[in-house]
């Protein structure tokens, strides 16, 4: 299929599921700041007037489980019951256990054995890259993120004073011969104050949110803008929908362009391969594309709990590879150590860097702390491939 429409969506930092993700990663960062080798699996639920924290945490760190969620909610912009959630008055409940000793015995290693640290669970993870954008990301998800990011900037700056924190975007792109041709449909649903006229809202979103973000040459002559299609979006955030950590895994990754192994990222320390191996797989795939070895590359890696070495590695280039996929897999095995501790070491993952990942995508962003986005292996791969 070379001619088709493909759609991806994103959500803003004020979407209830993203509120939960950001709280979980803020807890993780606060713990890693004091205890880099902590074991953290922090789950968050947020609903009307309530935040619940649960999961498994083993650490010597002392953190304020009450203040951190309130700080995140306040930073997002939920500061009044008038908009559905108030950082100062919401209740915060906690219910944490320690990591199971049955899991810990497969993950914990002495200093001499640390490179053989086992995976924290079984599972399969995917990484993907393509040449549709300079960031080597699929175009639909890349621009879906930028739209809700722009909505948040305009809201926080006060330029569009009627914007409120909760928002969603959706971008439909027409592909011809496998390449993105133009953007056919944009959907933006944004929470707003009750008194803004609809005409003002629609014009503001199109002119201030959409047009400054999307490249003019990509807009179809008959592009369709669907702005708040229900006509009203006043009740939003945790008051409108219950938010849960890990419920936006496609938004977090490639917008549906690539496969997903099912494991969420936020609230998990890097001993959990759901997170660290997915980051490593992106690192591998991005370097393959950056090296010019393929236009599209998807990497699957799989693990058994307590075992360091991956049980499988697969590469697909969807007919765009300069060398056979099997040869690429051999190339990856020579140049990348995908044992969990090696990933943590190579990508420097024991730092409190995860808060920034929790909204607007874990991939395709030019943040210095996003080490999985570097392309430092591209030249070595190209040389070894002999092209």
Swiss-Prot record:
Pathway noted in the entry: Amino-acid biosynthesis; S-adenosyl-L-methionine biosynthesis; S-adenosyl-L-methionine from L-methionine: step 1/1
Record organism: Nitrosomonas europaea (strain ATCC 19718 / CIP 103999 / KCTC 2705 / NBRC 14298)
Q: Which UniProt keywords apply?
A: ATP-binding, Cytoplasm, Magnesium, Metal-binding, Nucleotide-binding, One-carbon metabolism, Potassium, Transferase
Q: Describe the protein's quaternary organization and the partners it interacts with.
A: Homotetramer; dimer of dimers.
Recorded hits in CDD domains, A to Z, give: S-AdoMet_synt
What segment(s) does the record annotate as region Flexible loop?
A: 99-109
Positions bound to ATP = 15, 166-168, 232-233, 241, 247-248, 264, 268
- Biological processes annotated in GO: one-carbon metabolic process; S-adenosylmethionine biosynthetic process
What molecular function does GO assign, one term? Answer: methionine adenosyltransferase activity
- Tell me the Gene3D superfamilies matching this sequence: 3.30.300.10
The UniProt family comment states: Belongs to the AdoMet synthase family.
What EC class does the entry list? Answer: transferase
- Where in the cell? Cytoplasm
- Listed SUPFAM superfamilies: S-adenosylmethionine synthetase (SSF55973)
- What's the catalysed reaction? L-methionine + ATP + H2O = S-adenosyl-L-methionine + phosphate + diphosphate
Where does the chain bind Mg(2+)?
Answer: 17
InterPro entries per the UniProt record, alphabetical: ADOMET_SYNTHASE_CS (IPR022631), S-AdoMet_synt_C (IPR022630), S-AdoMet_synt_central (IPR022629), S-AdoMet_synt_N (IPR022628), S-AdoMet_synthetase (IPR002133), S-AdoMet_synthetase_sfam (IPR022636)
Q: How is the cofactor bound?
A: Binds 2 divalent ions per subunit.
Q: Which Pfam families match?
A: S-AdoMet_synt_C, S-AdoMet_synt_M, S-AdoMet_synt_N
Positions with a binding annotation for K(+): 43
- The coding gene here is metK
Give its E.C. classification number. 2.5.1.6
Name the UniProt record assigns to this protein: S-adenosylmethionine synthase
Binding of L-methionine occurs at: 56, 99, 241, 272
Residues of the signal sequence?
none
């Amino acid at each position: 299929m070379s001619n088709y429409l493909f759609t991806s969506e994103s959500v803003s930092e004020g979407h209830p599921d993203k509120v939960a993700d950001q709280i979980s990663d803020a807890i993780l960062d606060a713990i890693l700041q004091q205890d880099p080798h902590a074991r953290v699996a922090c789950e968050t639920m947020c609903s009307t007037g309530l935040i619940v924290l649960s999961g498994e945490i083993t650490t010597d760190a002392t953190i304020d489980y009450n203040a951190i969620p309130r700080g995140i909610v306040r930073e997002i912009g939920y500061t009044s019951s008038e908009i559905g959630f108030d950082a100062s008055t919401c209740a915060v409940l906690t219910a944490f256990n320690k990591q199971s000793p049955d899991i810990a015995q497969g993950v914990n290693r002495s200093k001499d054995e640390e490179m053989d640290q086992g995976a924290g669970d079984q599972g399969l993870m995917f990484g993907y890259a393509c040449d549709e954008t300079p960031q080597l990301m699929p175009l639909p998800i890349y621009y879906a993120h930028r739209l809700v990011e722009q909505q948040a900037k305009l809201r926080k700056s006060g330029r569009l004073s009627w914007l409120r924190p909760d928002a969603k975007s959706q971008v439909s792109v027409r592909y011809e011969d496998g390449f993105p041709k133009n953007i056919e449909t944009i959907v933006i649903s944004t929470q707003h104050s009750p008194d803004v006229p609809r005409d003002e809202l629609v014009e503001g979103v199109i002119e201030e949110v959409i047009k400054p973000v999307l490249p003019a040459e990509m807009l179809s002559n008959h592009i369709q803008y669907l702005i708040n299609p229900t006509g009203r979006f006043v009740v939003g955030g945790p008051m409108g929908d219950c938010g849960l950590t890990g419920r936006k895994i496609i938004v977090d990754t490639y917008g549906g362009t690539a496969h997903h192994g099912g494991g969420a990222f936020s609230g998990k320390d890097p001993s959990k391969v759901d997170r660290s191996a997915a980051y490593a797989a992106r690192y591998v795939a991005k370097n393959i594309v950056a090296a010019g070895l393929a236009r599209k590359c998807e990497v699957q890696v799989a693990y058994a709990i307590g075992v360091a070495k991956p049980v499988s590695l697969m590469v697909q280039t969807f007919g765009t590879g300069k060398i056979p996929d099997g040869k690429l897999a051999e190339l990856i095995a020579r140049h990348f150590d995908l044992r969990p501790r090696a990933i943590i070491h190579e990508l420097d993952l024991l730092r409190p860097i995860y808060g920034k990942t929790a909204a607007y995508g874990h991939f395709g962003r030019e943040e210095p702390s996003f080490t999985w986005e570097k392309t430092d292996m591209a030249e070595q791969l190209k040389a070894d491939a002999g092209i």
